[in-house]
A protein has these predicted regions:
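Terminal low-complexity segments of carbohydrate-biosynthetic enzymes
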Residues: 73-167
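Hydrophobic alpha-helix feature that most strongly marks membrane-spanning transmembrane helices
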Residues: 21, 37-43, 58, 80, ...
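Short, flexible, basic/aromatic active-site loop/helix in glycosyltransferases
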Residues: 1
Length: 167
């Protein structure tokens, strides 16, 4: 893969001396960017044999949450730093994704992705506090969209019987 997730990562001091610390991209794509940068500077990565951490696959998780902002923004940062960054292809892909969110009435998710793109375009100053400020901004932004509010099952009002099952 060319990188290792943080859970399987041991970083020798010489790597930090040569390439610096990971970028403060809380919390997605930071390990990928660091691994790509390490490999580009001659440091191979390897997963420790039999090491592993189980967590739900990212595709199983709820895509409509605040973390989507960091995924969009940080993937764009990584692409800009370590790829040919085909602006046309990225624009088409992101345009389709945001259109899909809007057509699906996932307005909060569309707004979240757009904020990630806008902040990427604003430049590196967005990384200054490691994400602390923007996390609060994203949560507030998303709270303006009713479909992003999670409700516990206990909040569902009692439903009157239609009488069908009572017969």
């Amino acid at each position: 893969a060319g990188y290792n997730a943080w859970w399987s990562c041991l970083i020798p001091a010489e790597v930090i001396s040569a390439i610096g610390l990971p970028l403060p991209m809380f919390f997605q794509w930071d390990d990928i960017e660091f691994g790509i940068r390490a490999r580009a500077n001659g440091f191979a990565t390897a997963t420790l044999p039999n090491a592993g951490v189980w967590h739900a696959d990212f595709h199983w998780k709820d895509r409509d949450d605040w973390s989507r902002y960091f995924s969009v923004r940080n993937s764009l940062i990584t692409a800009a730093l370590h790829s040919d960054f085909d602006v046309k292809s990225l624009s088409i892909m992101l345009g389709r994704e945001i259109t899909q969110f809007a057509v699906s009435m996932q307005y909060g998710l569309a707004h979240t992705a757009l904020k990630g793109i806008e902040d990427f375009l604003s430049g590196p100053s967005i990384l200054e506090d490691g994400g602390r400020t923007v996390l609060g901004e994203i949560r507030e932004l998303r709270s303006r969209h009713p479909e992003t509010v999670k409700h516990p099952a206990s909040a569902i009002p009692d439903v009157r019987s239609s009488g069908i099952a009572d017969a």
